[in-house]
Structures are given as C-alpha cells and as structure tokens.
C-alpha cells in the first residue's frame, strides 16, 4: 500500500501514482515543512485554486510553480501592494525569505516596517497616473486661494442667473404673442386684418347659434337688415 504524500495528507485528499502535489514537495526536506507549506498555500489560494494553478503547467515545471506561489504569497503578506517582485526590486528580499522560512517552520509571519526606498527603486509612483494630484501647478497662477475660488463661484452664479432671466423674458414674449391671431394672406383682401381672441371665439359660436331651434322670430326679423359692426381690438 502506497503512503500518501504530506501535501495530500494535510489536504485530506486521495494520493495516487499520478499525484500532482508530491513532485512539488521534493525540494523541501522536512515532512512537517511540506505539510505547513501546502496548508499555507491552500489557505491563501484555496484548495481548488492551488491545484488548478499547479496543473496549468507542464510536469517538469510544477515544482517551480509551487515554489513561486509560495514566495509570492509570502511577499503579498509582507508587502500587499508590490508583492515579492517589489521586495526584490527595492532590495528587501531578505524579508520575503524570512517569511518563507517562518511558513516552513509553522510560525506566523511577522510584519516589520519596510525601510524607505529611494525614488529609483519605487515601482509604483506615489500618485497613479489617473490621479490629478501628480500634475504640477503653474507657478504663475499663484495656486488656488480662497479669494480666487470665491470669485469663480460668484461669476458662475451671475452667469446662471442672467441665463435664467433671459429664458424667462423669452417665455413671457411667447405667451403674449398667443393673444393676437393673424389671418392668412388670402383673407387679408377682405379687409379683416387682425382679430382679437374674443372675436374669434364669437365667430366659432356663430354656427351653434344658427343651428338652434326656431323660436318663431324668423318672420319678424330679417337677417339681411341686421347691421354688423366690427371693431379692431
């Protein structure tokens, strides 16, 4: 009966002849260290995520993938922003190695403040490119003082009020123009000109008055003799 490897034992999974984790633990000498490293990576990447990352590469590269994942996880705990690459670039690789040794020995990773790296060793600038704070101000403008800010706010407020007054005056002019109706050019030859709104309404009601029931006054009143007087409003 074949004994399970230390990685499968700590993960409580079956181990067979084609085990994925067994070849990845050959560079670690101690059995406890192999179990500690596997358990740490399973907690960091997840059990299924760890196996998928290892199986994504060919067989001869899987031990290197396991080791790279271990160093990257320890580097992210020490420096969450830059990781192991940032620690190597800034000259703080010793802290990443100390974190790996602590994981192999089953000890917690201690957080130590990183020394201030020089500007040439910084991978990520203090302010990202989409942050406007990295743009230098023009010295001729004199900066953004409170007086300049108040002046700009007052100017914008006056422009807004002026535009509102203009819109209100245009709306009032449009409302007044609806009170006067102008007949088409064909009717202007009859001498009617302009009619007020009251005259137009009276002309609309005329057909209804003519179609009213006959009350017996048609014989006494002649419509042709009635004089109509039109006045311009």
From Swiss-Prot:
**Pfam families cross-referenced by the UniProt entry:** LOB
Q: Where is the LOB domain?
A: 3-109
Q: What family is this protein classified in?
A: Belongs to the LOB domain-containing protein family.
Q: Which PANTHER family match?
A: LOB DOMAIN-CONTAINING PROTEIN 38, LOB DOMAIN-CONTAINING PROTEIN 42
Q: What is this protein called?
A: LOB domain-containing protein 42
Which gene is this protein's source?
Answer: LBD42
């Amino acid at each position: 009966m074949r004994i399970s490897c230390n990685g499968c034992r700590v993960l409580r999974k079956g181990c067979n002849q084609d085990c994925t984790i067994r070849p990845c633990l050959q560079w670690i000498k101690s059995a406890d260290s192999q179990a500690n490293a596997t358990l740490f990576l399973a907690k960091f990447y997840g059990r299924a995520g760890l196996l998928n990352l290892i199986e994504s590469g060919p067989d001869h590269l899987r031990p290197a993938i396991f080791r790279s994942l271990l160093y990257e996880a320890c580097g992210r705990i020490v420096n969450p922003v830059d990781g192991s690459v940032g620690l190597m670039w800034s000259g703080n690789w010793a802290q990443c190695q100390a974190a790996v040794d602590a994981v192999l020995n089953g000890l917690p990773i201690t957080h130590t403040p990183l020394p201030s790296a020089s500007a040439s060793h910084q991978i990520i600038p203090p302010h990202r490119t989409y942050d406007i704070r990295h743009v230098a101000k023009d010295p001729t403008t004199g900066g953004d003082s409170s007086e300049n800010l108040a002046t700009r706010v007052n100017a914008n407020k006056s422009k807004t009020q002026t535009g509102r007054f203009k819109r209100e005056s245009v709306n009032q002019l449009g409302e007044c123009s609806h009170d006067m109706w102008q007949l088409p050019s064909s009717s202007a030859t009859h001498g009617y000109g302009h009619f007020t709104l009251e005259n137009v309404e009276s002309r609309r009601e005329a057909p209804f008055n003519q179609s009213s029931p006959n009350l017996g006054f048609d014989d006494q009143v002649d419509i042709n003799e009635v004089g109509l007087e039109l006045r311009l409003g």
